[in-house]
Amino acid sequence: APTKAPDVFPIISGCRHPKDNSPVVLACLITGYHPTSVTVTWYMGTQSQPQRTFPEIQRRDSYYMTSSQLSTPLQQWRQGEYKCVVQHTASKSKKEIFRWPESPKAQASSVPTAQPQAEGSLAKATTAPATTRNTGRGGEEKKKEKEKEEQEERETKTPECPSHTQPLGVYLLTPAVQDLWLRDKATFTCFVVGSDLKDAHLTWEVAGKVPTGGVEEGLLERHSNGSQSQHSRLTLPRSLWNAGTSVTCTLNHPSLPPQRLMALREPAAQAPVKLSLNLLASSDPPEAASWLLCEVSGFSPPNILLMWLEDQREVNTSGFAPARPPPQPRSTTFWAWSVLRVPAPPSPQPATYTCVVSHEDSRTLLNASRSLEVSYLAMTPLIPQSKDENSDDYTTFDDVGSLWTTLSTFVALFILTLLYSGIVTFIKVK
């Protein structure tokens, strides 16, 4: 098994309010670690406390588990904060802090008790209604005695432990634009989170029918906070999703009615209508970087993919920053932008940068390109501004190249003229 840090869970004894002369038992459950050997130390504040640590046990999955407990008088427990510090040879320490819970006795006397109910239903209080009928002196005494007995019973009876289980939550993730365009696939992910998922089962339906393939079941995962999660993935051809086929994920659990989530492509989709690529230039030193701004607008829904290419090679995502598409003013469509950082190259060799945009309603990839010679831009003292690729208010790189060619030709002819004049003069002198 690979190296794994332990998961640490704090445990406190019972729900009954302890008496002043009875101890409080605290425990740390350390589980799911590999390799073996952990060190457990208890502290009250900064002072270590004597504890009892049980032998390690190897689970069926080859990971280890152990537990450690501390017993302390109630009065001492209320005086400070207790910590269980776990050190694993292959990972960093984990600390769990114990806090004294609210008194169960106070809870029982201040609110009526309720029987546990299924999630989503109403719980009915079980307190008896007060009797208003006059029953005479003997009846009043019996009534007082009965009320006294009921009060004593409420004070001595152990209340129900509060449930800390996490309710099941189901989430359905629709296909990412990257998968739709780069893989020509529509991948759906159904995700469930809860406290006890060993009997949970996720199923799929495509247009009301069970798919015959393309389903990938994930393993049950246990997390450090005590919760569990499980997922299932369904992969379909992109054409089915574009055709508006409905996809349904259903969670089946023995203790709950089936929970269904449906994904359906938005029918009123609109492809982008405008794409622009602007140059952001500044008068920074030659070693500084330049910036390109790609803007796209007029699309719906907001799921869109903006990528950058440098000479037909994909740029790493760490080199540019996309923005989450906001809605356009007084419109049902969205707009987005991405800023690319172009580092100054060591040589004046120009590079072509392309902004590629894909949307689920576009039949083709939109793109806009710009050829940059960054060293020339950095050495030219320009006022910071935004220039559109279609405007003519700046010197193009083709013009710059022609200028250098003309100048080189002039210098070469001038040198040849000098050589010719020198040779003729030398012949005449001889």
Curated annotation (Swiss-Prot):
Give an example GO molecular function.
Answer: immunoglobulin receptor binding
Which sequence ranges are listed under topological domain Cytoplasmic? Answer: 428-430
Task: Show the ranges annotated as biased composition (Polar residues).
Answer: 106-118
Please, one GO biological process term? immune response
Instruction: Please give an example of a GO cellular component term from this record.
Output: extracellular exosome
- Regions that span the bilayer: 407-427
- Enumerate the UniProt keywords alphabetically: Adaptive immunity, Cell membrane, Disulfide bond, Glycoprotein, Immunity, Immunoglobulin, Immunoglobulin domain, Membrane, Secreted, Transmembrane, Transmembrane helix
What SMART domains does the annotation carry? Answer: IGc1 (SM00407)
UniProt-annotated stretches for the region Disordered: 96-167
* Glycosylation site list: S109, S110, T113, T126, T127, T131, T132, N225, N316, N367
Q: Which SUPFAM superfamilies match?
A: Immunoglobulin
Question: What PROSITE patterns does the annotation carry?
Answer: IG_LIKE, IG_MHC
In this UniProt entry, which cysteines form S-S bonds?
A: C28-C84, C190-C249, C294-C355
Ig-like domain boundaries? 6-98, 175-263, 267-373
* InterPro entries associated with the record: Ig-like_dom, Ig-like_dom_sf, Ig-like_fold, Ig/MHC_CS, Ig_C1-set, IgD_del_linker, Immune_Resp_Modulators, Immunoglobulin_dom
Where is composition skewed (Basic and acidic residues) in this entry?
138-158
Extracellular-side positions: 1-406
Q: What does this protein do?
A: Constant region of immunoglobulin heavy chains. Immunoglobulins, also known as antibodies, are membrane-bound or secreted glycoproteins produced by B lymphocytes. In the recognition phase of humoral immunity, the membrane-bound immunoglobulins serve as receptors which, upon binding of a specific antigen, trigger the clonal expansion and differentiation of B lymphocytes into immunoglobulins-secreting plasma cells. Secreted immunoglobulins mediate the effector phase of humoral immunity, which results in the elimination of bound antigens.
Its UniProt miscellaneous note says:
IgD is not present in every species and this does not relate to phylogeny and evolution. IgD is present in primates, dog, mouse and rat whereas it is undetectable in rabbit, guinea pig, swine, cattle, sheep and Xenopus.
Q: How does it assemble?
A: Immunoglobulins are composed of two identical heavy chains and two identical light chains; disulfide-linked. An IgD molecule contains thus a delta heavy chain combined with either a kappa or a lambda light chains. Kappa light chains are found predominantly on the membrane IgD (mIgD) form and lambda on the secreted IgD (sIgD) form, this fact is poorly understood. Membrane-bound IgD molecules are non-covalently associated with a heterodimer of CD79A and CD79B.
Q: What is this protein called?
A: Immunoglobulin heavy constant delta
